[in-house]
Amino acid sequence: MGVTQRGREFPGEFADVLIAAQAGEPLALRELFDWLSPAVAGFLRSRGAHDPDGSANEVFLRAFRTIQTFSGDDQRLRTWVFTITRNLLIDERRAAARRVELVFDDGRAPGREPRGDAEADALIALRDERVAELLAHLSPDQREVIALRVIADLSVDQVAAITGRGYEAVKALHRRGIAALRRAIEREGVPR
């Protein structure tokens, strides 16, 4: 029986894939990457990472460098990977505070070139902008918990382990964050 992630079955038996990944098998590493990378990139995007896809790749580089030290099941692996993700985001924010960023005349930062499909790029930018606007109504703690619970699809226990908060504190932040989002949407309406 495979492990499911939002309706997507984990390919193979987790224990077998983990053993192969720990031995450095490229296909096993790819299976783990394919299983978790959309949620990692989504979390990074929701938290305002400068280059979510590049940062997600860095998360997996860090994780795969030390995967042989990991022990646990699939949910423990998700928690471990999202702990790495959160730490990377903190590191990037600290580094960003110490550097000056170059910006092109058209407002793009280096590394943020269009992908070639202007319509798709525009829709992605609008969606990301709308999500960022809604998340701006939340406290930083609520934003983090909502991103981990909803976008990364982690359990309350996993979010508590990643953030170092108690179970009840995570539940309260999640509940208050959802209520604040609901109020913001009701106030502003849903764009058509």
Where are the regions that the model predicts?
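Amphipathic, Lys/Arg- and hydrophobic-enriched alpha-helical face
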Residues: F33-H50, T66, L135, A180, ...
